[in-house]
Design a protein with these regions (language model features):
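STAS-like cytosolic regulatory interaction modules
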Residues: 1-54, 58, 64-110
Length: 110
């Protein structure tokens, strides 16, 4: 499956749209995209997992590391994962990632 991390700015928020499988092989691509976004010191960064089809422990670890990096740079990091994305919601819940970084079920960008 094709993996893609697409940066965007929506309503003043830096957004990384993650498409495909976030796993051991693709987590480094997300890490690089997060570093690039944090290098410009956004006040907030949303990692949009709406189109993420699979998440393993390596991908979840990368999300937790991104949260730590964001805190260190003064950026508020949030994950966006709608309830319809059951496979990713399940992993986020099992690993209690919501205790590390807020997980939004929907977002309105203004």
């Amino acid at each position: 499956m094709l993996f893609e991390v697409e940066p965007a700015t929506v309503g003043g928020h830096a957004v990384l749209r993650v498409r495909g499988e976030l796993d051991l092989l693709t987590a480094p691509q997300l890490a690089q995209a997060v570093q690039t976004q944090l290098s410009v010191s956004p006040s907030s960064l949303i990692i949009d997992l709406t189109d993420t089809t699979f998440l393993d422990s390596s991908g979840a670890r990368q999300l937790a590391l991104a949260a730590r990096q964001a805190r260190g740079s003064g950026t508020v990091l949030q994950l966006l994962c709608p309830p319809g994305n059951k496979p990713v919601q399940l992993v986020l819940g099992l690993l209690e990632l919501g205790k590390v970084v807020p997980v939004l079920e929907s977002a309105t960008f203004s």
